[in-house]
Structure formats: C-alpha cells, structure tokens
C-alpha cells in the first residue's frame, strides 16, 4: 500500500 510513497523515494 506504499507503492506511491516508494515511487517518490525511488
């Protein structure tokens, strides 16, 4: 559920 958060940190 953190795909959006991970994508931003990537």
Swiss-Prot record:
Entry's Gene Ontology BP terms: defense response to fungus; killing of cells of another organism
Coiled coil: none
Entry function: Has strong antifungal activity against M.arachidicola with an IC(50) value of 9.8 uM but lacks antifungal activity against F.oxysporum and B.cinera. Has hemagglutinating activity towards rabbit erythrocytes. Has antiproliferative activity towards L1210 tumor cell line with an IC(50) of 3.6 uM. Lacks mitogenic towards murine splenocytes and does not inhibit HIV-1 reverse transcriptase.
Keywords linked to the UniProt accession: Antimicrobial, Fungicide, Hemagglutinin, Lectin, Plant defense
Further information: Antifungal, antiproliferative and hemagglutinating activity is abolished by incubation at 100 degrees Celsius for 15 minutes. Antifungal activity is abolished by incubation with trypsin at 37 degrees Celsius for 30 minutes.
Similarity section: Belongs to the leguminous lectin family.
Domain of life: Eukaryota
Disulphide linkage map: none
UniProt KW Ribosomal protein keyword: no
Taxonomic lineage from the root: Eukaryota, Viridiplantae, Streptophyta, Embryophyta, Tracheophyta
GO molecular function, one term: carbohydrate binding
Keyword Zinc: no
Protein name, as recorded: Antifungal lectin PVAP
């Amino acid at each position: 559920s953190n795909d959006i958060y991970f994508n931003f940190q990537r």
